[in-house]
Amino acid sequence: MVSLEQAEQIAAAIEVPDWVLTKSAALVYSCFGSAANAFESSIKINFPAQHAFVEAWMRARSHPFAERLPYLNPWHVIASILAYLSLIVTLRLLHRVLGKFSCRTLGLVHNLGLHLLSLYMSLGLMISARAAGYSLWNNAVGTSPAEWRIAKLIWLFYVSKVVEWVDTVIMLLKQNYHQVTFLHVYHHTTVFVLWWLALLVAPGGESYYSAMVNSGVHVFMYGYYFLTLLFPSGIVRDVLSKFKFAITKGQMWQFVFNCLQSAYDLVWVPREELKYSAELLQILFWYMISLLALFGNFLVKNKKFSHRRCVDAATASGAKEDTAARSHGDRTHRTRVKAGMTNMQLERLKNEKSTEMKLLMRKNGNGNGQKASLQAMAGSR
């Protein structure tokens, strides 16, 4: 196991620089800040009481780190989700105008980028948690430099949820509408809101575990998506196809681990010894239960669909072979019938010649009959 000293050195070396937060915030707000601020102003004018309530609640519950982390304005979060949902509806309505895109290059860059980012976040959180002296579960949120390092990684994880919305854009541009399900949209919107809440109230402590495990699963998930785009057919693709359902099962296992974490903290740990927000742990538990139910339903439906496709393909192949066999049999039968009719005609012709020969023999006598028979036989030849 890595010692605390070694973990501190590694964590410091891979720490997210503070300028990444400030520069990215300046860039994003320069592009979308005016629209987000206009949305907040409209809320403040039309719903002043609700706006004041949310602001007061945030001031009372915010962690000190929340003031240093960008993108935590709740009205900007709501505006982002509304923009995401509007984009889904717009791309769906304009499918005939826009046409169908392959999005292969975009998909390769997007999936590889999220694969590498997930790898960085997963390993970074693991090492930073070790450097901060965390145990597996029941960890408190502090304000030390080591915990600020963890808070920045969790913030990066939170921002990556917006980047993952590109998944939906690619599906819609490829017109794979069957993939944009209720589960897909529900998961992509709610997870963004819940991590906003975690960063606002408790950006560290127990939240490191969920972010670390989810990032680890996404390492394999986005790596799988990248490779399937890179190898659309062939031996590699055949091997990858065997892991299709393993990705969904891996996601479900992470939900199970998160449920176990919440149950351990809420049930096993005495409430006076609990170091993290009980409210956040309860939200995490029930949210994981909802995802387990939805992903389980998705897995069952997809397995049934894949089985039905295999059965349909086998049935179609068998029907094709039966049709070919019947066609070959019909041709053989027709040839045999034709050959049979020819033999019957020849037999009838011989019988007619034989009858004719007998009549001639009776009419002309033996000598003349023999001569006539010879002539008749010559004629038959």
UniProtKB/Swiss-Prot annotation:
The chain crosses the membrane at residues 10-30, 69-89, 107-127, 153-173, 182-202, 216-236, 280-300. A motif (HxxHH motif) lies at residues 184-188. Its EC number is 2.3.1.-. Signal peptide: none annotated. Keywords: Fatty acid biosynthesis, Fatty acid metabolism, Lipid biosynthesis, Lipid metabolism, Membrane, Transferase, Transmembrane, Transmembrane helix. GO terms for biological process: fatty acid elongation, monounsaturated fatty acid; fatty acid elongation, polyunsaturated fatty acid; fatty acid elongation, saturated fatty acid; sphingolipid biosynthetic process; unsaturated fatty acid biosynthetic process; very long-chain fatty acid biosynthetic process. Belongs to the ELO family. Involved in the synthesis of fatty acids. Elongates C18 polyunsaturated fatty acids (PUFAs) with a preference for Delta6 PUFAs. This is Fatty acid elongase 6. It comes from Leishmania major. The gene is ELO6.
